[in-house]
């Protein structure tokens, strides 16, 4: 999932 990268902030 790319959610983890999106929430990397």
UniProtKB/Swiss-Prot annotation:
The keyword Acyltransferase does not apply. Conversion of fibrinogen to fibrin is triggered by thrombin, which cleaves fibrinopeptides A and B from alpha and beta chains, and thus exposes the N-terminal polymerization sites responsible for the formation of the soft clot. One of its GO terms (biological process) is adaptive immune response. Transmembrane segments: none annotated. Cleaved by the protease thrombin to yield monomers which, together with fibrinogen alpha (FGA) and fibrinogen gamma (FGG), polymerize to form an insoluble fibrin matrix. Fibrin has a major function in hemostasis as one of the primary components of blood clots. In addition, functions during the early stages of wound repair to stabilize the lesion and guide cell migration during re-epithelialization. Was originally thought to be essential for platelet aggregation, based on in vitro studies using anticoagulated blood. A long coiled coil structure formed by 3 polypeptide chains connects the central nodule to the C-terminal domains (distal nodules). The long C-terminal ends of the alpha chains fold back, contributing a fourth strand to the coiled coil structure. GO terms for cellular component: extracellular region. It comes from Papio anubis. This is Fibrinogen beta chain. Its main location: secreted. Keywords: Adaptive immunity, Blood coagulation, Coiled coil, Disulfide bond, Hemostasis, Immunity, Innate immunity, Secreted. Heterohexamer; disulfide linked. Contains 2 sets of 3 non-identical chains (alpha, beta and gamma). The 2 heterotrimers are in head to head conformation with the N-termini in a small central domain. It comes from the Eukaryota. It is found in: Secreted.
């Amino acid at each position: 999932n790319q959610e983890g990268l999106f929430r990397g902030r």
